[in-house]
């Protein structure tokens, strides 16, 4: 079953959906499909009152949380979908994965002397991992780079990742200092995400001079790979969306030719081998 906060969010979504459907139905000539959708919403709200919302109508186990967040009218768990429903879900996941990959930057990215490379491999069809590289509008000057991870899994996480991508693409054009950009992004993200949803994120600006300014919202340390070893750059603020107010101080470093900055998500550091041993931060820094 979902938490009370999630149920409150889902109830709000259902009520808003009902009002929109009723308004559309009033302006139509008795559309049967709209009337059926209104009935489905009423059934879902009734199940909330009875305490059975979120339970599979076949086996009475919980419907997957990410599927309810994506569609509050879901009433069957994955194990009890009909063949047409399963095919429709597979088609939706395939489309979501295609959209998500289309948002990734070029694999080989070069800008003002900087070379960026990344590897993206979701654990399932879609994920909440986020990666972007944004050139300035005039094509010269600093490069904005971001790596993050949103809370949750599956389709719900991928939808949140898409929201994060669109938000930073829009805010990047404002020209704010990095710490102010992060604070504004936090307020926007907090206002649009549901309670309990958040994102960890490293955001940075790289200049042609080799200077790099970094701000981290609760994300795993960035690894500065230098000639003399590896330096960890820790988070400077809380995850985005956790609280609507917060500060995100930045730190500026200077990379010399041949040095690099390694950013990653927990899919790397928490990977386990056949003996169920976690890879861990220490081994990652020793690569």
Name these PLM-found stretches.
Residues 57-59, 79:
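Short, cysteine/histidine-rich loop/knuckle motifs that typically chelate Zn2+
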Residues 63, 84:
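Cys/His-rich microdomains that often coordinate metals
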Residues 85-262:
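… and, occasionally, acidic/histidine-rich disordered N-termini of signaling adaptors
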Residues 70-82:
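Cysteine-rich micro-motifs
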Residues 183, 202, 254-263, 268-287:
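C-terminal catalytic subdomain
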Residues 1-50:
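Interaction interfaces in information-processing and related assembly proteins
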Residues 66-72, 87-89:
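Short Cys/His-rich "knuckle" micro-motifs
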Residues 49-53, 73:
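Short metal-coordination and nucleic-acid-contact micro-motifs, chiefly zinc-binding Cys/His arrays
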């Amino acid at each position: 079953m979902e938490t009370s906060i999630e149920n409150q969010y889902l109830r709000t979504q259902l009520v808003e959906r009902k009002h929109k459907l009723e308004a559309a139905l009033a302006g139509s000539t008795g559309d049967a499909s709209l009337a059926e959708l209104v009935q489905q919403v009423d059934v879902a709200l009734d199940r909330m009152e009875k305490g059975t919302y979120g339970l599979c109508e076949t086996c009475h186990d919980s419907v997957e949380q990410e599927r309810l967040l994506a569609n509050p009218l879901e009433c069957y768990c994955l194990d009890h979908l009909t063949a047409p429903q399963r095919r429709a879900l597979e088609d939706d996941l395939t489309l979501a994965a295609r959209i998500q990959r289309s948002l990734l930057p070029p694999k080989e990215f070069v800008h003002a002397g900087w070379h960026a490379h990344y590897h993206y491999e979701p654990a399932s069809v879609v994920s909440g991992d986020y990666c972007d590289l944004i050139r300035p509008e005039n094509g010269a000057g600093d490069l904005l780079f971001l790596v993050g991870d949103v809370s949750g899994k599956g389709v719900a996480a991928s939808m949140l990742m898409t929201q994060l991508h669109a938000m930073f693409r829009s805010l990047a054009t404002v020209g704010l200092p990095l710490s102010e950009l992060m604070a504004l992004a936090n307020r926007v993200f907090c206002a649009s995400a549901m309670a309990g949803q958040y994102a960890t994120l490293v955001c940075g600006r790289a200049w042609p001079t080799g200077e790099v300014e970094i701000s981290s919202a609760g994300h795993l340390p960035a690894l500065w790979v230098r000639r003399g070893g590896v330096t960890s750059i820790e988070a400077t603020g809380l995850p985005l969306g956790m609280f609507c107010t917060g500060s995100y101080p930045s730190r500026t470093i200077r990379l010399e030719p041949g040095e690099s900055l390694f950013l990653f998500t927990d899919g790397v550091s928490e990977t386990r081998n056949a003996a169920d041993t976690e890879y861990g931060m220490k081994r990652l820094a020793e690569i």
